[in-house]
Amino acid sequence: MDKISNIYNFDDPPPDKLSLELFIIEKKIGKGQFSEVFRAQCTWVDLHVALKKIQVFEMVDQKARQDCLKEIDLLKQLNHVNVIRYYASFIDNNQLNIVLELAEAGDMSRMIKHFKKGGRLIPEKTIWKYFVQLARALAHMHSKRIMHRDIKPANVFITGNGIVKLGDLGLGRFFSSKTTAAHSLVGTPYYMSPERIQESGYNFKSDLWSTGCLLYEMAALQSPFYGDKMNLYSLCKKIENCEYPPLPADIYSTQLRDLVSRCILPEASKRPETSEVLQVAEHMNNYFSPSGDQSTTPSTQF
């Protein structure tokens, strides 16, 4: 049994014995409205984890408390190499603590900033290498009827081995087979779909919009709807009207530019299915991979 299984199966200690005393907090690695995330060492097994501490009783809003508990339920259902893994949860010192897989190297936003600071674009081969892993993670989530609702570079973690881990499901929502849409304005404005801004109800296609925005940002090194002097109103109008600069045709492939434009469509029903996005990503990653035949033009059948 590996180290991860030891903690995941609660072999030692049992779940009702978990407490903050069993973790050595090393440093803070993230902060949210109601939470802080720390790099921590488990004392009973040689394993570093991300310990997310949520101030449960400071959340006077009942919905916020439910969202935190919902995050735990969602994570229990997910088991994929490209999704941050849930290990355990417990309440200690009036805090809800969630023990998560640690992604050491950082996140996609850090990688984008690195290239932007260096005045370089991310090579398309590299874009597909990471994007295909995100597409796999999203396909797994959607197959479980789970929507992420906050896909953005800062929530796409990258390990030291170059493995993508989609995380931060605090805004996730479980969709039963009878549920067709959700009505709550949450998420990051730059990546929010028109239907979410208009609060007209949305479904899994909103994740595809955000995924298209992320793919665009990997290529352009900035959000498609970014502006130097923008307020929330002007941002929302740009999103609703799908006003964004096209990616340069002389730098990026037709397939990449086409996938972006298909995901960033105002009408959710016209966006591709998650399976289609994954198919394109797999095809393009195979084309750009070292073992691929670089002399062959990539297919445009998608």
Swiss-Prot record:
<keyword id="KW-0963">Cytoplasm</keyword>
<dbReference type="InterPro" id="IPR000719">
    <property type="entry name" value="Prot_kinase_dom"/>
</dbReference>
<dbReference type="GO" id="GO:0046872">
    <property type="term" value="F:metal ion binding"/>
</dbReference>
<keyword id="KW-0217">Developmental protein</keyword>
<dbReference type="GO" id="GO:0042303">
    <property type="term" value="P:molting cycle"/>
</dbReference>
<dbReference type="GO" id="GO:0005737">
    <property type="term" value="C:cytoplasm"/>
</dbReference>
<keyword id="KW-0067">ATP-binding</keyword>
<feature type="binding site">
    <location>
        <position position="52"/>
    </location>
    <ligand>
        <name>ATP</name>
    </ligand>
</feature>
<comment type="similarity">
    <text>Belongs to the protein kinase superfamily. NEK Ser/Thr protein kinase family. NIMA subfamily.</text>
</comment>
<dbReference type="Pfam" id="PF00069">
    <property type="entry name" value="Pkinase"/>
</dbReference>
<keyword id="KW-0418">Kinase</keyword>
<dbReference type="GO" id="GO:0005524">
    <property type="term" value="F:ATP binding"/>
</dbReference>
<dbReference type="GO" id="GO:0016324">
    <property type="term" value="C:apical plasma membrane"/>
</dbReference>
<dbReference type="InterPro" id="IPR011009">
    <property type="entry name" value="Kinase-like_dom_sf"/>
</dbReference>
<keyword id="KW-0547">Nucleotide-binding</keyword>
<comment type="function">
    <text>Probable serine/threonine-protein kinase required for the completion of molting.</text>
</comment>
<keyword id="KW-0479">Metal-binding</keyword>
<feature type="domain" description="Protein kinase">
    <location>
        <begin position="23"/>
        <end position="288"/>
    </location>
</feature>
<keyword id="KW-0723">Serine/threonine-protein kinase</keyword>
<dbReference type="GO" id="GO:0008406">
    <property type="term" value="P:gonad development"/>
</dbReference>
<dbReference type="GO" id="GO:0035264">
    <property type="term" value="P:multicellular organism growth"/>
</dbReference>
<dbReference type="InterPro" id="IPR008271">
    <property type="entry name" value="Ser/Thr_kinase_AS"/>
</dbReference>
<feature type="active site" description="Proton acceptor">
    <location>
        <position position="150"/>
    </location>
</feature>
<dbReference type="GO" id="GO:0004674">
    <property type="term" value="F:protein serine/threonine kinase activity"/>
</dbReference>
<keyword id="KW-0808">Transferase</keyword>
<feature type="binding site">
    <location>
        <begin position="29"/>
        <end position="37"/>
    </location>
    <ligand>
        <name>ATP</name>
    </ligand>
</feature>
<keyword id="KW-0460">Magnesium</keyword>
<protein>
    <recommendedName>
        <fullName>Serine/threonine-protein kinase nekl-3</fullName>
        <ecNumber>2.7.11.34</ecNumber>
    </recommendedName>
</protein>
<dbReference type="InterPro" id="IPR017441">
    <property type="entry name" value="Protein_kinase_ATP_BS"/>
</dbReference>
<dbReference type="GO" id="GO:0106310">
    <property type="term" value="F:protein serine kinase activity"/>
</dbReference>
